[in-house]
Amino acid sequence: MAAGGGQAFAWQVFPPMPTCRVYGTVAHQDGHLLVLGGCGRAGLPLDTAETLDMASHTWLALAPLPTARAGAAAVVLGKQVLVVGGVDEVQSPVAAVEAFLADEGRWERRATLPQAAMGVATVERDGMVYALGGMGPDTAPQAQVLVYESRRDRWLSLPSMPTPCYGASTFLHGNKIYVLGGRQGKLPVTAFEAFDLETRTWTRHPSLPSRRAFAGCAMAEGSVFSLGGLQQPGPHNFYSRPHFVNTVEMFDLEHGSWTKLPRSLRMRDKRADFVVGSLGGNIVAIGGLGNQPCPLASVESFSLARRRWEALPAMPTARCSCSSLQAGPRLFVIGGVAQGPSQAVEALCLRDGV
């Protein structure tokens, strides 16, 4: 059921993390929010692992990661949390894969990636972990697609992505993994491709209409949304440098085409490097960076039923570069940058679901 209006949403503020961080890796498992690694105040990757008990609202320290890292991917596999790739203390991508065994409170090393990579996108389906793309030590974007078999602790290669990239957005819909955007070096990628898990083949869909860095992406009700970001200079605009935009582009999976929504349906605020998600039939955009000198606290939602944007309650702690995670009726916004790495943990909630 669609939730309507700003009154349908509220912020839930949790105790701050013991360790402030940005680019942390987050996972939700059995009523616990795990925050792993990331970069601290010194700007170096952390091996710190902490968990928030959602029932008691208390933080506990976990055994440190064997490999300090930031910007890693995480996948929950039953009672384990698998941490994949990332970047180490010398700013080099890592190949290390490690699993946290929740029942035993310890880490185990797993089969490493064939190539070190940061910005890997991961998806879990039926106990199999799919890893797509990444950036290697030579800074070149990767097209590799891997599947992890946990029973045999091994990575197998699958057909490569048509467009190499890192930091892409991925969505699992039916038997397909959709891969949108990402980057090649400093350049944003406009490719939109889908991998069929049954036939193990790739399909190229029409590319994003506009080239934007640090855009937000979400999927809801059979459509994929690409929001905001930094518009890149090009032959079709008069800007000489990147600029914040409030663009809204929507891809209809059934009809296979992009629609660039008119000016009247653009976001209320121009923003980039923000959190985006789907709650109660609404696409929500949270925080980020805009034309102001500090991070944004503003929050807005696009109702898929009413086809309009509405202001929501502001984020208690204005931030950008946050980690995020959706768990039921909550969209968690974790850490990030305020006036430095943040300890804040807050969740935008549907009032009826909390």
UniProtKB/Swiss-Prot annotation:
Transmembrane segments: none annotated. One of its GO terms (biological process) is mitotic cytokinetic process. It comes from Rattus norvegicus. Signal peptide: none annotated. It holds the Pfam family Kelch_KLHDC2_KLHL20_DRC7. SMART domains: Kelch (SM00612). This is Kelch domain-containing protein 8B. Keywords: Cell cycle, Cell division, Cytoplasm, Kelch repeat, Repeat. Kelch repeats lie at residues 1-31, 32-79, 81-127, 128-175, 176-222, 224-281, 282-329, 331-354. InterPro entries: Kelch-typ_b-propeller, Kelch_1, Kelch_domain_containing_8. GO terms for cellular component: cellularization cleavage furrow; cytoplasm; cytosol; intercellular bridge; midbody. Involved in pinching off the separated nuclei at the cleavage furrow and in cytokinesis. Required for mitotic integrity and maintenance of chromosomal stability. Protects cells against mitotic errors, centrosomal amplification, micronucleus formation and aneuploidy. Plays a key role of midbody function involving abscission of the daughter cells during cytokinesis and appropriate chromosomal and nuclear segregation into the daughter cells. The keyword Hydrolase does not apply. It is found in: Cytoplasm; Midbody.
